[in-house]
Amino acid sequence: MDRLFSHPSPVRIQCRTFVRPLRQRYPNRTMTTPTPRKTRATGRPTLEQVARRAGVSTITASRALRGLSTVGVEYVDKVREAARELNYVVNPAARALARAQSETVAVLVPSLTNNVFTDVVEAIHATLRPHGIEILIGNSHYLRDEEEDLVRYYLASPPMGMIVTGFDRSEAARRLIDASGVPCVHMMELAHAENVYCVGFSQEDAGDAVAKHLLARGCRHNAFIAAQLDPRMLQRGEGFRRALQRAGMHEPDLEILTPAPSSIGLGCELFRQLIARRPDVDGIFLGNDDLAQGALFEARRMNIRVPEDVAIVGFNDLAGSADCVPRLTTVRTPRAEMGETAAQLLLSLIRRERVAKPTIDLGFELVVRESA
């Protein structure tokens, strides 16, 4: 059995017009059912016509068609029925021009191939979609310049809000976000600063917990292997390093860091390098589960027993980690909860609601399985 260690109604407006029936005014004409009146410019029915037919205000009709939860079900049904009768189709461009702001939220992440971020983005989308808000996904590829370009692009037609990854960005991008007035939530990391809203956990504390676990197992030569080298990877490495230093057991040559993208294949390669350099290593913390899974595969090929000869710990508890042989000990990160919480926090900011906790620490779990 795995052992888990936790660280910390709309107002209805109805207009009535009294007009003498057409048959009384034109008794000799054949009367037919009128077709919906179109707009002069486009020939399409308007939102105002939908609202009149449904007997609601224009704003209620707009909200009902967007699926906002602030509109009662009975009004939603009336508005949608009126829209069907009139063959009304929403014009997103006209809506955006009328509001001078699109009903979207921009989400900036450094990768769309890393399952960590796809899990978070999916949770953000699932939380915002019922409120009629779509997301615009920007992929910076871990590059500050690309993220700055994305910030400029999205703010040129301001979204309702932004969710960004961490705090490591160019000063220009930071100034653009601050000056835009667009509500912004940071995720993945924590900061305790005025007017900064963030959802995440302490990466350093997570690295610290891994080091303490390996030391408690009796591992005396503990290595850290990391790839990609984004700020969060470096923070968890720093927490691991400091814990070893406090114990007087830090060895600089037991660190292998590479900017190459994290992968299972890279985990195999870096494990071989480490064993060739220091065959006496008996504990390894790999900064992501794909690296750790690769290390497990390579250890088996090299006839190195895990955990008897070397203990292996990963990070993020990605798919497959519970099915490896041996099953991988790792740090479980609250990715879905993080995306949902960040989206809920942003909704509060968009609605100008009071936010009791601008910094939300979701913590992490050390999941102890068979590999360490």
Predicted feature locations:
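N-terminal helix-turn-helix DNA-binding module of bacterial transcription factors
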Residues: 5-103
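Residues at alpha-helix caps and immediate loop-helix transition turns in enzyme cores, especially N-
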Residues: 75, 116-120, 147, 173-176, ...
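Short beta-strand segments enriched in small/hydrophobic residues
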Residues: 53, 58-63, 97-113, 213, ...
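Short beta->alpha connector loops
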Residues: 141-144, 165-170, 290
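Short histidine/acidic/glycine/proline-rich micro-motifs that form metal-
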Residues: 66, 111-114, 141-142, 168, ...
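Bacterial carbohydrate/catabolite-sensing allosteric modules
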Residues: 2-41, 85, 123-131, 155, ...
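Amphipathic helical "hinge" segments at domain boundaries
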Residues: 32, 73-74, 86-153, 158-161, ...
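Acidic, Gly/Pro-rich loop/turn segments at junctions of secondary structure
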Residues: 161-173, 186-195
